[in-house]
């Protein structure tokens, strides 16, 4: 069952999670932080949304839709759902080491998702969130975070183009996800990313204006949260949120102060949300976009960071591009070096961190706060397992054929996501994963 995130093993779990939410409402947008099994989880979500609209049809008409009506409901649902699935398998290898399928197979299925989105006019859902956040959390400095993330993004573009997709058919389905820390480079991270992306998309790929626009989400730095004097974490988060707003991020997540040690509480989440609300509704300067634009430090930093990122691109190219660099563990090695540098400076005091290595309370116990660690109970875990077994029993007569078809599609190089959309109706996450292991290969972790 696990302890991190929500346990979603079946379509029933997905429906229960979103019960009460209209998944096709313009005001509903769902972001799913899932990577290795992202295609399967995404298929469950899409089916949950379709089934929800079918249930609405039954409620209004008092009958099940016929085949033509069901097809229309499915088409309308896919065109309406809004959200993001993370799915970035490149950063998963570089920064987290938690892939489940082979990298090549994972890239192929990512392309299948985008191809399915293009064919079914899924225009409001991002097929991937190209993520630098995890790279930063693993230890990378802001330059490496931005360079690795953008190079990963261009790798996806090249992979999709190689499959025959037109750049303007998929570029709008790509989004980015960055961390904002305390270093000065974070102040211009968004504007540098947009400058590099727009230039490449226009002049290298011939993309239209919409495709040149880089859309990105910012989450304040989890690594900057400390267990010592946790109340100070809100101050750090506020500063990081402020520069994110000044840099015109498209969306923002502010961390709760107690995430340094546990799942946040209702109180800490409310405080984190208040940070955004106060900036947006009370802080006067926030009404103006690009408040810092034109200042010497912003313009200078923008040019310096862009040059540093382009130099990192050259180093990656010298190693055969992103995939070639991954084979020699270039990105992972650089992340480890920068993480070690950060930790050494933190422990030596060269990098001052208030309440951690300087400005310490006279009584060290003053900074210690008793916090309940939130974990799933054994009863909750057994309830989840019982639900899984019940779902598998109900679909047993159809699951075997669905899994066989899934493997056939994968072996023949057809669209795996299309098959997952059917398979998810009667098979669990584990069943589909095991079936794909046999034909797609299993990821072997590197140290």
Please describe what each predicted stretch is.
Residues 2-5, 132, 137-139, 164, ...:
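Glycine-centered flexibility sites
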Residues 19-23, 50-54, 111-123, 151-165, ...:
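Generic secondary-structure signature for well-ordered alpha-helical cores
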Residues 22, 77, 88, 102, ...:
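Alpha-helix initiation/capping motif
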Residues 29-34, 138-142, 224-229, 260-262, ...:
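A short glycine/serine-rich beta->alpha loop
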Residues 147-156, 175-355:
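Active-site capping/gating regions of soluble enzymes
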């Amino acid at each position: 069952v696990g302890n991190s995130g929500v346990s979603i093993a079946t379509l029933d779990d997905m429906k229960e999670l979103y019960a009460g939410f209209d998944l096709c409402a313009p005001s509903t947008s769902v972001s799913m932080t899932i990577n290795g099994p992202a295609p399967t989880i995404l298929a469950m979500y899409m089916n949950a949304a379709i089934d929800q609209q079918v249930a609405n049809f039954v409620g209004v008409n008092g009958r099940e839709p016929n085949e033509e009506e069901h097809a229309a409901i499915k088409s309308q649902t896919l065109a309406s759902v809004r959200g993001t699935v993370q799915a970035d398998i490149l950063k998963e290898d570089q920064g987290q080491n938690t892939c489940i399928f082979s990298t090549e197979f994972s890239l192929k299925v990512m392309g299948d998702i985008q191809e399915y989105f293009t064919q079914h006019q899924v225009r409001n859902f991002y097929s991937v969130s190209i993520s630098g956040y995890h790279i930063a959390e693993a230890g990378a400095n802001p330059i490496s975070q931005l360079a690795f993330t953008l190079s990963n993004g261009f790798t996806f573009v090249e992979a999709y183009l190689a499959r025959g997709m037109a750049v303007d058919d998929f570029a709008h389905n790509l989004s980015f996800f960055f961390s904002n820390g305390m270093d000065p480079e974070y102040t211009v991270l968004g504007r540098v990313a947009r400058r590099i992306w727009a230039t490449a998309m226009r002049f290298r790929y011939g993309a239209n204006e919409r495709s040149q626009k880089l859309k990105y989400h910012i989450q304040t730095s989890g690594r900057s949260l400390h267990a010592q004097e946790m109340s100070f974490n809100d101050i750090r988060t506020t500063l990081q949120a402020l520069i994110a707003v000044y840099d015109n991020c498209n969306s923002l997540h502010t961390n709760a102060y107690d995430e340094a040690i546990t799942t946040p509480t209702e109180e800490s989440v409310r405080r984190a949300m208040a940070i955004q609300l106060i900036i947006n509704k009370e802080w006067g300067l926030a009404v103006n976009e690009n408040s810092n634009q034109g200042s010497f430090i912003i313009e200078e930093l923008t040019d310096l960071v862009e040059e540093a990122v382009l130099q990192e691109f050259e180093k990656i190219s010298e190693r055969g591009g992103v995939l070639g660099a991954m084979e020699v563990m270039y990105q992972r090695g650089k992340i480890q070096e920068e993480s070690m540098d950060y930790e050494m400076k933190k422990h030596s005091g060269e990098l001052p961190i208030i309440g951690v290595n300087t400005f310490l309370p006279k009584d060290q116990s003053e900074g210690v706060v008793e916090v309940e660690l939130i974990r799933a109970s054994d009863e909750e875990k057994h309830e989840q397992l019982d639900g899984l077994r019940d779902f598998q029993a109900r679909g047993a007569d159809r699951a075997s054929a669905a899994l066989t078809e899934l493997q056939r599609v994968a072996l023949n190089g057809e669209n795996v996501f299309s098959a997952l959309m059917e398979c998810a109706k009667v098979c669990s996450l584990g069943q589909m994963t095991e079936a794909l292991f046999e034909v797609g290969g299993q990821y072997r972790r590197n140290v």
